[in-house]
Amino acid sequence: MLEKIQETATFLREKMHTSPETAIILGTGLGSLVHEITDKYEISYKDIPNFPVSTVEGHSGKLIFGKLGNKDIMAMQGRFHFYEGYSMKEVTFPVWVMRELGIKTLFVSNAAGGTNADFEIGDLMIIRDHINFFPEHPLHGKNIEYGPRFPDMSEAYSKELIDKALEIAKEKGIKVQQGVYIGTQGPTFETPAEYKMFHILGADAVGMSTVPEVIVANHCGIKVFGVSVITDLGVEGKIVEVSHEEVQKAADEAQPRMTTIMREMINRI
């Protein structure tokens, strides 16, 4: 595994024209943040040694190096999901590579179903903690020496970055929620009973990604900031049939607000 990580990092280092310390993983419907990136170098996942290939509609599958405002960044346009059949090691492989390339801060975004009755479709929820409901753990097996065998997860999402985001949202007049994200394997959307269970467990939103990458980032010593776009509601009386297209539409409508917060945060760290 370590050899593969180093091989991929060496390949990318030879192509890179910048030295980013910040990376972004862009989720469903949020890939258009790439239009803000200047001085771009793009490479398709299929052309990167050892990289899996994303199969989800709306995920274009590219690694992008460039500038967002005045900061060098690395962006993943399209992520890998456990439900696609990848192992957890494959899902999180790009995060290991980020660590090898010198990334210090990771921004993650996703689309999620809200289980909190105070949430509305289109809300941005700053993730302050998560619950890992996946059946497999990304650190299962031999420890990769980027971090300890038993990593601390008491601050999986940086409090400093959360405070900065709240400050920016207030300054820009953007409404944000805060909450706990629960990650499940999918690919089915949740039943009403599952939504109810997740809420009882302490989750405010549920989705099919993010948690594995965040666990690995924490193991590697990378600071994390995460945001969910609430694209459907799993609240009694508000549950309706949901499709991938509707999720995408809600995420696209939230994109300008997400872009503003992400751009400002990256330029202020």
Which residues are covered by each model-predicted region?
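His/Asp/Glu-rich mid-to-C-terminal helical/loop segments that flank catalytic regions of hydrolases
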Residues: 235-269
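Active-site/ligand-binding-proximal alpha/beta "capping" segment
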Residues: 162, 167-204, 262, 269
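Non-catalytic positions within long, well-ordered alpha-helices that form the structural scaffold/packing
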Residues: 99-102, 199, 218
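Polyanion-binding loop/helix "lid" in catalytic or ligand-binding cores
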Residues: 146-157, 183, 195, 250-259, ...
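Zn-dependent metallopeptidase/amidohydrolase metal-coordination segment
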Residues: 208-246
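Metabolite-binding pocket within alpha/beta catalytic cores that recognizes anionic/polar moieties
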Residues: 1-153
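Short acidic/polar active-site loop segments enriched in Thr and Asp
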Residues: 104-105, 204, 223
